[in-house]
């Protein structure tokens, strides 16, 4: 009997690395995909490749896109500063249409592979307030995916799996550690240096640091200071 196949979106960060481990623990053959989309640094892409290999990815793809061409985000436009204090509302680190674009390409690869499951590490608890990380968005995207694909209209239902959606950052870390995730290999910082060292000031660093504190485990993050 052949194993189930899944496409896993990986960024090299804490959440998506945990998702690979979860998918493997659920018996999936994992095919991982990352995106070089014009983000501020490439350290996360290196981390994505390393963590995908560490968790047994059968194939890892890096898709090149230029979301910086449309701008509108501090992650793709260096003229917009990454906030180093908590802000209200949707922050400037939100990348317009990012998850929609990423999921669509992952969906295409899933069709080619014959995979019916796509995993993404979105979270609606300890997160930055991005609209494309909400349960309503994921449910709507899954509906669209089943209307827009050959296998979907032939009755083989595709699923967008979001195992972290209702977990706190501390719970994510605890689950990952139980599955053998080495968080030293991950890069979460919005403005990490070329060596993957974190700024310790951005929203992503704040949530990550808070998560390790609340989980009661030492923070393995390498900081630039």
From Swiss-Prot:
What's the family? Belongs to the QueC family.
This molecule's function is given as: Catalyzes the ATP-dependent conversion of 7-carboxy-7-deazaguanine (CDG) to 7-cyano-7-deazaguanine (preQ(0)).
Signal peptide (residue range): none
Catalysed reaction(s)? Answer: 7-carboxy-7-deazaguanine + NH4(+) + ATP = 7-cyano-7-deazaguanine + ADP + phosphate + H2O + H(+)
Top enzyme class: ligase
Report the cofactors.
Answer: Zn(2+)
The residues the record assigns to binding ATP are 10-20
Recorded GO MF terms: ATP binding; ligase activity, forming carbon-nitrogen bonds; zinc ion binding
Q: What does the entry list as the binding residues for Zn(2+)?
A: 189, 199, 202, 205
- EC number(s) on file: 6.3.4.20
How and how many cofactors are bound, per the record note? Binds 1 zinc ion per subunit.
Q: What CDD domains does the annotation carry?
A: QueC-like
Q: In which pathway does it act?
A: Purine metabolism; 7-cyano-7-deazaguanine biosynthesis
Keyword terms, alphabetized: ATP-binding, Ligase, Metal-binding, Nucleotide-binding, Queuosine biosynthesis, Zinc
- Name assigned to this protein: 7-cyano-7-deazaguanine synthase
Q: Which Pfam families match?
A: QueC
- What does the record list as GO biological process? queuosine biosynthetic process
Presence of the UniProt keyword S-adenosyl-L-methionine in the record: no
Q: Which NCBIfam families match?
A: 7-cyano-7-deazaguanine synthase QueC (TIGR00364)
């Amino acid at each position: 009997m052949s194993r189930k196949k899944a496409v896993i979106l990986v960024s090299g960060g804490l959440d998506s690395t945990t998702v690979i481990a979860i998918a493997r623990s659920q018996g999936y053959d994992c095919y991982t995909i990352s995106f070089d989309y014009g983000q501020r640094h490439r350290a996360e892409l290196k981390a994505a490749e390393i963590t995908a290999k560490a968790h047994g990815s059968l194939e890892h793809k890096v898709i090149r896109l230029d979301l910086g061409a449309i701008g509108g985000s501090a992650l793709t436009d260096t003229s917009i500063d990454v906030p180093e204090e908590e802000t209200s509302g949707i922050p400037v680190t939100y990348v317009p249409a990012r998850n929609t674009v990423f999921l669509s390409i992952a969906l295409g690869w899933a069709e080619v592979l014959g995979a019916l499951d796509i995993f993404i590490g979105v979270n609606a608890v300890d997160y930055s307030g991005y609209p494309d990380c909400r349960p309503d968005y994921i449910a709507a995207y899954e509906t669209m995916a089943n209307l827009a694909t050959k296998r979907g209209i032939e009755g083989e239902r595709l699923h967008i799996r979001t195992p972290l959606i209702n977990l706190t950052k501390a719970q994510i870390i605890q689950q990952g550690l139980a599955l053998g995730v080495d968080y030293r290999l991950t890069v979460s910082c919005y403005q990490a240096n070329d060596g993957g060292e974190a700024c310790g000031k951005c929203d992503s660093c704040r949530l990550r640091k808070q998560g390790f504190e609340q989980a009661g485990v030492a923070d393995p993050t390498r900081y630039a200071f």
